[in-house]
Design a protein with these regions (language model features):
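Structured, hydrophobic secondary-structure cores that serve as assembly/anchoring elements
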Residues: 1-201
Length: 201
């Protein structure tokens, strides 16, 4: 780009920055650990919890309905609430069938964000962890979240700041660019969310 800049290349790099920042924001909103980053949903004290077993276990529709109930019991189960999990759990759920051999979660149910489970939106992000541990199931457990995501507050402070560093990679002719954006995340009401943390995948 330094040798032959074009508007197309500049726009491509801009889109790369936006995608990277969005990915990080998604990751922290879901599972931020509070160390130099905000606490995400899964690290928020007081959210509902459904346990599958001592060593985790396979996901079932009953457990997903129990997860929904942890929010409903606190009167936070609004029509706009939904499920969020990763593609491993989505794959397992997509294979479950009812007594009439009909899929519980249609594998052809539309675009991401348009599928439904128990009449609620079913969303997927691989930023939902799949490397959790429960008992002897080490590093193979996934999470699933149910909640009213309008109670997940994301505040962005100031505008995106780009800092150019022409020095660090000077000898190779490279230029470093760092993007900075002030962000804070908070769960407005812990009762608006519930999670399963021991789905073996």
């Amino acid at each position: 780009m330094q040798l032959q800049a074009t508007p197309e290349i500049e726009e491509l790099i801009r889109q790369d920055f936006i995608a990277l920042l969005a990915q990080k924001l998604d990751q922290v909103a879901i599972n931020g650990g509070g160390s130099n980053e905000p606490n995400g949903i899964l690290q928020t004290s007081g959210i509902g919890s459904v346990v599958i077993g001592t060593n985790g276990g396979a996901i079932t529709l009953d457990k997903m309905l129990d997860l929904k109930q942890t929010v409903a019991v606190d009167n936070a189960d609004l029509p706009t609430a939904g499920f969020l999990t990763n593609t491993k759990v989505e794959n397992a759920l997509s294979k479950l069938k009812d007594g009439n051999s009909q899929y519980l979660l249609s594998p052809y149910g539309g675009e991401i964000g348009q599928q439904q489970l128990a009449n609620r939106t079913f969303m997927v992000s691989n930023n939902v962890p799949s490397n959790l541990t429960k008992g002897s199931s080490s590093g193979v457990c996934s999470a699933a979240i149910y909640g009213n995501f309008s109670d997940l507050l994301i505040g962005m402070f100031g505008s995106l700041e780009l800092l150019v560093d022409p020095y660090t990679q000077f000898q190779s002719g490279g230029v470093g660019i760092r993007a900075l954006q002030g962000v804070d995340i908070a769960v407005r009401h812990a009762e608006s969310f519930g999670a399963i943390l021991d789905i073996t995948t």
